[in-house]
Amino acid sequence: MKKIALYTMMLGLGSLALTSCGDAMDEITSIVLDRDFAPIGLEAKSATENSITLEWTKSHDDVTYTVEIFADDSLSFAGSATNTFTGVEATKLKIIGLVYDTKYSARVMTIDNADASRNSKWSNVFFRTSAQQIFETPTENDIADRSVIMTWPAGEAATSVRVYADESLVKEQALTADEVAAGKVTVTGLDPETTYAIRLYNGEKQRGSKTITTIADLNGATLVREGDDIRALIEAAEDGAVLALYGGTHVIADAEEEGKSGAAKVSKSIVIKGIYPTNVPIVKGRFEILDGASLEINQVIIDGIDNSTTDQAFNFKTADVTYPLMSVQNSEVRNFGKGVYYLNVASTVQKLEFLNTKIHGIECDGGDMFDCRKGRIDELNFINCAMYNSCAARDFIRMDDASDLGGAPVITVDQCTIDGCSNNAGKRLLYVRYVGNIIKWSNNLVTNTAAKWSNQSKTGVPEFSNNAYFNCANLNVLDGADAGKTNLFIDESGKAVGNPNFKDAANGNFAIGNEDVSKLGVGCTLWNVK
């Protein structure tokens, strides 16, 4: 009986299992939705003043697309579409005839050609057309220190100009009917030596944009044009005068030799500066500085090529006075016979500086390149300068011992490129003998010189930091002999590097082509890409 019951139960379970297998679902081979997919990957590309290209991904075959465009809209799709396109078969559509500098919303729907009830929902995107550019480029004469003249085709509609500095709105100036008719406006209220974006608007739509940099401050300045008697203007200037030079060549005429350049006597503290950074003025001649006057030069080329003498570019002539400042920045000093400056009287210069300046073609026949004999310079700075093709057989920086005048001169040479200067084994880069001197030498690139540092016991050991040297064999030789053949010190932290591969040293382009040298952060940065 037990066996019969067990067989009966097993048979029943087997029947149940067979019944379950027979109820399996059919294989799913397709999905039928109630509507088509909306276009995916919708993008607005290649915006111009009056066109846009829309692109999307096709969902499946046997569909077309409807495209609607709404102007001055940000995906609200309010009101009526400004453009409608139906029956579009491609998935790329270029739309033209749009309005410049305008916000648009676009939407695309998939149209099922077999069953309109299955049309998709909308896919949306927004974009802005490009602003126009009807501004004409201002000429050099259009740009002043506190204003700029902007022009565009006469009669083209516009309502205002807006002025931006660092993308911040500085001012908005409404246009008059006469200005619109003429296509010309003078934008006022600007600051000197400042970069602005000037934008032309018609309502809220931008029709033009130009970036300008105002020129040096001309407030109260004496304007000097090519052909003016610059020597007379300098010598008649009062304390605090600013001479603003237009581009061109300005000759300090020699008093005795016709056709030659001479010296202008600077007896009052003055500033000489170029007006246009794009057209740096050339001053042919030299300067004799008298009676404790300060002289500041900015954005000027000082050229001694036609001088009647080989004297230095700057010569301090009056003894027993204090000169507060001589400053040369953003400039170029070239083609002088004896040297760059000369202090051979018992006077003090509180600060003498060269900043962002190129100095070259200084022969040094009869003088050293930077030459102080009987005077005292409290602070001597060379910052981000390039000195090259100069001083073939003389010392580079010379400062004799005039320590009876007191003080402790501080010499700073930082971020400079010095190429081929004092290229003679008997000459020194630092012929400094003024007792108590302090020398700071940092971030410099020195190349192609046979010079030594100093063999003088009075030369302070410089504070060296992050300097690089190429082809400077004698700067590494330490013999420790006072007045010996080579050096009392060397730059122990300096790096001997490979050829910097200057872009065009022969023509004064010292952009560094050797990446290993460039990444050290040494040398003059005037050629760095901005």
Predicted regions mapped to residue ranges:
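Pro/Thr/Ser/Gly-rich low-complexity, intrinsically disordered linker/stalk tracts
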Residues: G22-D61, Y100, D115-E156, P192, ...
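Acidic, glycine- and Ser/Thr-rich low-complexity intrinsically disordered tracts
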Residues: Q456-K530
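Right-handed parallel beta-helix
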Residues: S294-G304, Y323-N335, V349-C364, R376-A392, ...
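Beta-solenoid repeat scaffold
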Residues: D239-V242, A253-G285, L290-V300, A496, ...
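Short glycine/acidic-rich loop motifs that flank beta-strands on beta-rich extracellular proteins
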Residues: D254-A255, I282-F287, I305-F314, N335-V345, ...
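Beta-strand-rich modules
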Residues: I95-S117, V187-G208
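Acidic Gly/Asp/Thr-rich repetitive segments characteristic of extracellular carbohydrate-active
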Residues: A216-D254, E515-G523
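Recognizes extended acidic, P/S/T-rich segments that occur
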Residues: T66-D101, N113-A114, R162-D191
